[in-house]
Amino acid sequence: MNGRGPVGPPRSGPVRSPATRRAGGDPLIRLFHVSKSYGPGSVALRDLSVEVRKGELVFLSGPSGAGKTTLMKLLFAAERPTEGQILVLGRNVARLGERRIPALRRRIGVVFQDFKLIQTRSIEENVALALQVLGRPPREVRSKAFAMLRRVGLQHRRHELPAALSGGEQQRVALARALVNEPAILLADEPTGNLDAELTIEIMDLVAAAAARGTTVLVATHDQALIRRYARRTLRLAGGRLLEDIPGGSI
């Protein structure tokens, strides 16, 4: 199995917003009629078709249970679809062999609401770990970890443990860890859910900067004020269905 499958859906293709149609190059993310069920009466996603191109920052909006987190899990192969096809960086996730999943995940950064930092390791070690598991040389690991911590404004606290940092600072560390390997895609699941308004903007500015450098970014959020502030393309989900694909600037 080579991790790739047929890309032509039997029905109409993914939804493209006007901004997506204007963008150059092939989409990095493509979903064709994707559904995800966890059993009878437990359908998380229903017939979702959409695509996202390089450098787009896209919000996933909707209430709890809308399917936002399930979609994120499908994109980095933590879950497999019940129906449909998912192409991420040219790989068919629905058919990707277990041995090929780590290679895909190396190109995807993930940020969670609860940070998921290793509490017994320093800030620098948390960020460096993302490079160490790839077998990067120690000198490169130290250099890139320091540079990324400087980008998020925490290089002066690199030797401290996560518990010594505020919630906003820990989220910046989580973001640095997700971006240190220069991923093609960044998935952020409610990255500002536990932060106040000032810290929310701080984190989102860093996320937007990553998109400006060419990273494709998906942000799941309940925060409508945040969506209005950044005025980017928004996929509005409810009951596992895509209700609207709203172009940036239209919200």
Predicted regions and their residues:
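Conserved ABC ATPase signature
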Residues: L161-L165, E169-Q171
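Conserved ABC transporter NBD signature motif
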Residues: G84-N92, L104, K144
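Helix-to-loop junction immediately C-terminal to a conserved catalytic motif
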Residues: F76
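ABC ATPase NBD coupling module
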Residues: V93-G109, P138, A212
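Catalytic Walker B motif of ABC-type/P-loop ATPase nucleotide-binding domains
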Residues: L186-D189
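Short coil-to-helix segment of the ABC ATPase nucleotide-binding domain corresponding to the Q-loop/switch region
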Residues: R121-L129
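Conserved catalytic motifs of ABC-family nucleotide-binding domains
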Residues: E182
